[in-house]
């Protein structure tokens, strides 16, 4: 998505205006594989939008009805909104770039997609990191004075941290516009013949990319890894303590702790894969139509969907609401026919 094609050694390349786009790069994938990738992406987008829409609707309804919402619910609302917007944007971008390349290549349209994509991805990374941080502070069993003071103040800090993340993400997305430029060379010689072929070359602003990598991706990634790992260790230690005190492996409390450990581990793996795929995709390491680039897109689309399905399964309130929704959807056609 970040690659713009510029003929080398032209003013367009330097000014980043009135871009003269190259023809689309030749795809190295078969039509069947391209169709399969598009189908997988579409399914992931729809699952992510439905799952995040459900989470957002439940907590937003609670917010409106009770004039208040839990801190974790507030974070989930922010996270769900960012993911719905991101999944919708990615689905819209694929549709427009596939059906109307000339319109998609216009500067205003291209940069609108580019800035929105980076902004929503960074928001999603930060919100998920704050969710992990909040659970760590509330659940982990540590007795350090600083940790206890943080636990007492975390509820009041979270709203400010969420809006600060929005500001950081927006500022950083504006800064990252000109990190990478991709242009084509139409006269690359083929030594085995007298013909030439088109190649796509990239120029990367290394300083900008380093800043982009550290602030936009690595900072929330490190925070998520540290808090999730410490929370897993705390839960594991507490579970071992409960086991040594006797109650047996079928104790509901112990099963709940083990379920929490598995869920957090699952979140951690998804988050790391998504962050790595996002960095590779944004830095244009591979050709835009290569298998690796498409694999990064699949991972990025799978993360919001997979990361949202598990809370619905593990959270009793969300699980009950989901079952009620399924029951209503099942009964509605029967009532309509009557």
Curated annotation (Swiss-Prot):
Its main location: membrane. GO terms for cellular component: membrane; plasma membrane. The chain crosses the membrane at residues 31-51, 75-95, 117-137, 157-177, 206-226, 263-283, 292-312. One of its GO terms (biological process) is detection of chemical stimulus involved in sensory perception of bitter taste. Glycans are attached at residues 185, 194. Pfam families: TAS2R. It is found in: Membrane. Residues 52-74, 138-156, 227-262, 313-338 are cytoplasmic. It comes from the Eukaryota. Residues 1-30, 96-116, 178-205, 284-291 are extracellular. Gene3D superfamilies: Rhodopsin 7-helix transmembrane proteins. Keywords: G-protein coupled receptor, Glycoprotein, Membrane, Receptor, Sensory transduction, Taste, Transducer, Transmembrane, Transmembrane helix. It is a multi-pass membrane protein. GO terms for molecular function: bitter taste receptor activity; G protein-coupled receptor activity. PANTHER family: TASTE RECEPTOR TYPE 2, TASTE RECEPTOR TYPE 2 MEMBER 39. Belongs to the G-protein coupled receptor T2R family. Receptor that may play a role in the perception of bitterness and is gustducin-linked. May play a role in sensing the chemical composition of the gastrointestinal content. The activity of this receptor may stimulate alpha gustducin, mediate PLC-beta-2 activation and lead to the gating of TRPM5. Most taste cells may be activated by a limited number of bitter compounds; individual taste cells can discriminate among bitter stimuli. This is Taste receptor type 2 member 39. It comes from Pan troglodytes (Chimpanzee).
């Amino acid at each position: 998505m970040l690659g713009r094609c510029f003929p080398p050694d032209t003013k367009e390349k330097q000014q980043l205006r009135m871009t003269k786009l190259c023809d689309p790069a030749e795809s190295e994938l078969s039509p069947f594989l391209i169709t399969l990738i598009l189908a997988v992406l579409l399914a992931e987008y729809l699952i992510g939008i439905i799952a995040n829409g459900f989470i957002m609707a439940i907590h937003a309804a609670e917010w409106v009805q009770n004039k208040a919402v839990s801190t974790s619910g507030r974070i989930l609302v922010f996270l769900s909104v960012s993911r719905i917007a991101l999944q919708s944007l990615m689905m819209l971008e694929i549709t427009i770039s596939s059906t109307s390349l000339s319109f998609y290549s216009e500067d205003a349209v291209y940069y609108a997609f580019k800035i929105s994509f980076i902004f929503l991805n960074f928001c999603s990374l930060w919100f998920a990191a704050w969710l992990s941080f909040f659970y760590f502070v509330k659940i982990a069993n540590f007795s350090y004075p600083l940790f206890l003071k943080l636990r007492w103040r975390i509820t009041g800090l979270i709203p400010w941290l969420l809006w600060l993340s929005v500001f950081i993400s927006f500022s950083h997305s504006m800064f990252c516009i000109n990190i990478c430029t991709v242009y084509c060379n139409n006269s690359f010689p083929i030594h085995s013949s007298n013909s030439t072929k088109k190649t796509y070359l990239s120029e990367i602003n290394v300083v900008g990319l380093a800043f982009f990598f550290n602030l936009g991706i690595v900072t929330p990634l490190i925070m998520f890894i540290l808090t999730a790992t410490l929370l897993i260790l705390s839960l594991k230690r507490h579970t071992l303590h409960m086991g040594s005190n006797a109650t047996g492996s079928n104790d509901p409390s112990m099963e709940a702790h083990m379920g929490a450990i598995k869920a957090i581990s699952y979140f951690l793996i998804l988050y790391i894969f998504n962050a790595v795929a996002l960095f590779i995709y944004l830095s244009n390491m591979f050709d835009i139509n290569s298998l690796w680039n498409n694999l990064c897109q699949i991972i990025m689309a799978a993360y919001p969907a997979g990361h949202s399905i598990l809370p619905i399964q593990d959270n009793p309130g969300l699980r009950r609401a989901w079952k009620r929704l399924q029951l209503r959807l099942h009964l509605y056609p029967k009532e309509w026919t009557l």
